[in-house]
Design a protein with these regions (language model features):
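Central antiparallel beta-sheet cores of small beta-barrel/beta-sandwich binding domains
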Residues: 24-146
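N-terminal cap/lid segment of alpha/beta-hydrolase-fold proteins
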Residues: 145-186
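Short substrate-entry loop that stabilizes the transition state in hydrolases
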Residues: 186-188, 196-239, 325-326, 358
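The conserved beta1-alpha1 loop
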Residues: 194-196, 353
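Alpha/beta-hydrolase active-site loop
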Residues: 245-282
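Primarily recognizes the serine-hydrolase "nucleophile elbow" in alpha/beta-hydrolase
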Residues: 270-341
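The feature captures the conserved acid-bearing segment of alpha/beta-hydrolase catalytic domains
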Residues: 315, 321-377
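C-terminal catalytic histidine-bearing segment of alpha/beta-hydrolase fold enzymes
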Residues: 375-418
Length: 418
C-alpha cells in the first residue's frame, strides 16, 4: 500500500465506530449530516469564536475534508462534525468532541488531529499516527453554502502552469506550480520551495500528487513573501516523464547506482532552473535574488542549485535534505556529490534536520554538512527532537523550526522592515 493509501486508511480507521456511512447530504464526495448546525458562540473570546463555523480543505491533496465546529464554550470545549471522502474510500462523517487551547483545536478521543488558526483566517491541520503525518489547510465557508442541494467546493488552491524551454518527444513541457501569496498585487520577494521524492519510487500513483506545504506557505506569506511550489516533470500535473534516477526496471524504483541516480538529480535541477526563470518574470515577483528551499530531495536540490546559480540566490532552506536514503550503500557518495556542488554559493545557508530520520540519520546528514563546508560552503546545522521520533516529518512542526528560520532570514537580510 502507498504512503498516501496508508495515511488514508489510518485517518478513516481511526474514526472508529459508530460513524455515518450513508450520506445525509453529499458535498461533492463528502457526506455531512442533514442536521448540521452552527450555534453562534456567546460570551467567548475572539480567538474561540474564530473557530466556529464550517471549514473545507484536503488531506494530502487527495482526501477531501470538511470540519464543522457546531458549538464552542467559554472554557474551550467544542463539538465538531468531522467528514472525509474521495481517494477510493467510502465517505464518512462522525460527531466528535474537541478542545481549544490557545490557537489550536484538538479533536479528543484517539484521533490525533489538530487544527491551528493562522493570521490569514485559515486552519492549518495536522494528523499524526505512527510515522504517517498528514497536512491540510482549511478555508472558511458558510454552512449555508454546504447545505445547498448539489453543493460543490474548491478543495485546493487552483494550480498554475509555467511555460518552459524543456521539450520531450518534440513537444513543449509545462510545469505545474502552486502559488501562495499575500493580498495585493505586489511585487513580493520570492521563495521557491521544492518537493521531495515518492518514498522508494515504486508506486506510480504517488507521482501525480501535487505538493505544497501549508506550514511554509503560512510562515512566509505572513511575512510578505510569494511562495511557489513547482512540480518537476512527471510530478503532479506537470508534463513529461518522471525520471529522477530510476532503475532500468522502473518497477524497482529509484536506483542506488550513482551512474543512474546523479543524472536523475541533474534532470531535476534542470526543471528547477526552468521554473525559477519563469517565476522571476511574473509581475507580482520582486526583482533581485530569491530564496530557494526544499524538503528531502528538494532540500539537497536547493543547496546544489544555489551553488550552480549563486547570482540568483539570497539564501537556502534545507529541510531534511538528501537524494538517496542510507538503505543504499552508495548514499554517502551520491548525497555528498550533490551537497558539494553547493559549496560555491558562499552565502549562509540553513540546514534543518530531525533526529531519528528513517532515511537520513543525524550522523549521515552532519557528514554531508562537513562535505559541503569543505567545498567552501557556509551554513548552520540544527537538529530537532521531533515528536514520535519521526525526524523526516520535521516540516510539519513549525513550532520547532520557525524561530531558527526567522533568525536566519534576519541574518541574510531577507526580512522586510515591519
Amino acid at each position: 500500500m502507498s504512503r498516501i493509501g496508508i495515511f488514508c486508511f489510518f485517518i478513516i480507521a481511526s474514526m472508529g465506530a459508530p460513524f455515518a456511512v450513508a450520506a445525509d447530504m453529499l458535498v461533492d464526495d463528502v457526506p455531512i449530516p442533514a442536521d448540521a448546525r452552527v450555534e453562534v458562540p456567546l460570551e467567548v473570546s475572539e480567538t474561540l469564536s474564530r473557530f466556529s463555523g464550517a471549514w473545507v480543505g484536503s488531506w494530502g491533496d487527495r482526501l477531501h475534508h470538511i470540519l464543522i465546529v457546531e458549538d464552542i464554550s467559554a472554557s474551550g470545549e467544542a463539538h465538531v462534525v468531522y467528514a472525509v471522502g474521495n481517494n477510493g474510500v467510502k465517505g464518512v462523517w462522525r460527531r466528535l468532541e474537541a478542545t481549544v487551547s490557545g490557537n489550536a483545536l484538538t479533536i479528543d478521543d484517539t484521533f490525533n488531529a489538530t487544527y491551528v488558526l493562522t493570521p490569514a483566517d485559515s486552519l492549518r491541520a495536522t494528523y499524526r499516527r505512527g510515522d504517517a503525518v498528514g497536512q491540510a489547510t482549511l478555508s472558511r465557508i458558510a454552512l449555508t453554502e454546504l447545505m445547498l442541494p448539489g453543493a460543490h467546493v474548491a478543495w485546493a488552491t487552483p494550480s498554475e502552469f509555467l511555460d518552459t524551454r524543456l521539450q520531450e518527444g518534440g513537444k513543449p513541457i509545462r510545469l505545474e506550480v502552486v502559488i501562495k501569496k499575500p493580498s495585493g498585487s505586489g511585487p513580493f520577494p520570492l521563495l521557491v520551495f521544492n518537493h521531495g521524492s515518492t518514498g522508494r519510487g515504486t508506486d506510480s500513483n504517488l507521482f501525480t500528487a501535487t505538493y505544497a506545504s501549508p506550514q511554509i506557505a503560512d510562515f512566509f506569506v505572513e511575512k510578505g513573501w510569494i511562495v511557489a511550489f513547482p512540480q518537476r516533470r512527471g510530478r503532479g500535473k506537470s508534463d513529461g516523464l518522471y525520471d529522477e534516477g530510476f532503475a532500468p526496471d522502473r518497477a524497482q524504483g529509484y536506483s542506488c547506482d550513482s551512474g543512474r541516480s546523479l543524472p536523475g538529480a541533474d534532470r531535476a535541477l534542470d526543471d528547477i532552473k526552468e521554473a525559477v526563470d519563469a517565476l522571476r518574470q511574473r509581475s507580482d515577483v520582486a526583482a533581485g535574488r530569491i530564496l530557494i528551499g526544499g524538503i528531502s530531495r528538494g532540500g539537497v536540490l536547493a543547496i546544489a542549485y544555489a551553488g550552480m546559480h549563486p547570482e540568483q540566490v539570497l539564501g537556502v532552506l534545507n529541510f531534511v535534505g538528501g537524494w538517496m536514503g542510507e538503505g543504499c550503500s552508495t548514499a554517502a557518495e551520491i548525497n555528498g556529490a550533490l551537497f558539494q556542488r553547493g559549496g560555491k554559493f558562499g552565502r549562509p545557508t540553513l540546514w534543518l534536520y530531525g533526529q531519528h530520520d528513517r532515511y537520513y540519520s543525524i550522523e549521515h546528514s552532519r557528514s554531508n554538512f562537513d562535505v559541503f563546508k569543505k567545498a567552501g560552503g557556509n551554513g548552520e546545522f540544527f537538529e530537532y527532537a521531533v515528536p514520535g521520533g519521526i525526524g523526516h516529518a520535521l516540516l510539519a512542526y513549525p513550532n520547532l523550526w520557525s524561530g531558527d528560520v526567522e533568525r536566519y532570514l534576519t541574518v541574510i537580510g531577507a526580512l522586510r522592515a515591519q
